[in-house]
Amino acid sequence: MSNQAENTTHFGFKTVQEDTKADLVAGVFHSVAAKYDIMNDVLSMGVHRIWKRFTVDCSGIRKGQKVLDLAGGTGDLTAKFSRIVGQTGQVTLADINDSMLKVGRSKLRDLGIVGNVSYVQANAEELPFPDNHFDLITIAFGLRNVTDKDKALASMYRVLKPGGRLLVLEFSTPLYEPLSKFYDFYSFNVLPKLGKLIANDSESYQYLAESIRMHPGQEILKEMMNSANFEGCEYFNLSGGIVALHRGYKY
């Protein structure tokens, strides 16, 4: 009985077997892929673009470098990094979900972003890249969906070059009680209804709200990064802590 308990994890507020979570998460993103970008704009009122711009500004990325945009979905960050690294650099858009990758590839090609971008279907816990390969790894709104976050952070550390940086952009814990109450009301009462209205899928957005609540808060995630051997770990609260950007280095 204890072994069974040890092999469980959270899927939103539900407790599930670890080996089933990836398939459950895949079902969510297969469902929302086609409407993912428009839902991001609607649900965040466009603010997600500001969060991502701040992430790019904190990246320190330069021309000619290699970037891994992990759980990169529809490619918002990949598009930005592609322009910065130029034709002598390389951006790898990786996602475990092939539906999201297809949407991202089509979108970036329509934007004329080709040549320095590659697409890889990959599990964050077992990245299929050489050691010490990337100058920068970003994972935006993806870590909370990973089954074994510690294993994923260790995998990211392995493929990052010495001197490289990891940036984790993720929903977090609001800093102020009034904001937290409003955020809870919006998350559990408005998000699912908008999901039903726009994407014909309320359950996936119910999962979104629940998965955010189960994700480690700012200090805990910082300690997890420290435990994965990242150094100089710090975080920046955005929008009152609704989102946080964590940054760590490999030396």
Curated annotation (Swiss-Prot):
GO biological process, one term: methylation
Binding site for S-adenosyl-L-methionine: T74, D95, N123, A124
NCBIfam families tied to this protein: MenG_MenH_UbiE, PRK00216.1-1, PRK00216.1-3, PRK00216.1-5
Entry EC no(s): 2.1.1.163, 2.1.1.201
A Pfam family: Ubie_methyltran
Native organism: Psychromonas ingrahamii (strain DSM 17664 / CCUG 51855 / 37)
UniProt entry keywords in alphabetical sequence: Menaquinone biosynthesis, Methyltransferase, S-adenosyl-L-methionine, Transferase, Ubiquinone biosynthesis
HAMAP family hit by this protein: MenG_UbiE_methyltr
Catalytic activity entry: a 2-demethylmenaquinol + S-adenosyl-L-methionine = a menaquinol + S-adenosyl-L-homocysteine + H(+); a 2-methoxy-6-(all-trans-polyprenyl)benzene-1,4-diol + S-adenosyl-L-methionine = a 5-methoxy-2-methyl-3-(all-trans-polyprenyl)benzene-1,4-diol + S-adenosyl-L-homocysteine + H(+)
Classification via PANTHER family: 2-METHOXY-6-POLYPRENYL-1,4-BENZOQUINOL METHYLASE, MITOCHONDRIAL, METHYLTRANSFERASE
Parts of the chain that traverse the membrane: none
UniProt GO MF annotations: 2-methoxy-6-polyprenyl-1,4-benzoquinol methyltransferase activity; demethylmenaquinone methyltransferase activity
Protein name stated in the entry: Ubiquinone/menaquinone biosynthesis C-methyltransferase UbiE
Keyword presence, Transport: no
Gene it is expressed from: ubiE
Family: Belongs to the class I-like SAM-binding methyltransferase superfamily. MenG/UbiE family.
Record function comment: Methyltransferase required for the conversion of demethylmenaquinol (DMKH2) to menaquinol (MKH2) and the conversion of 2-polyprenyl-6-methoxy-1,4-benzoquinol (DDMQH2) to 2-polyprenyl-3-methyl-6-methoxy-1,4-benzoquinol (DMQH2).
Pathway: Quinol/quinone metabolism; menaquinone biosynthesis; menaquinol from 1,4-dihydroxy-2-naphthoate: step 2/2; Cofactor biosynthesis; ubiquinone biosynthesis
Classification of source organism: Bacteria, Pseudomonadati, Pseudomonadota, Gammaproteobacteria, Alteromonadales
InterPro entries: SAM-dependent_MTases_sf (IPR029063), UbiE/COQ5_MeTrFase (IPR004033), UbiE/COQ5_MeTrFase_CS (IPR023576)
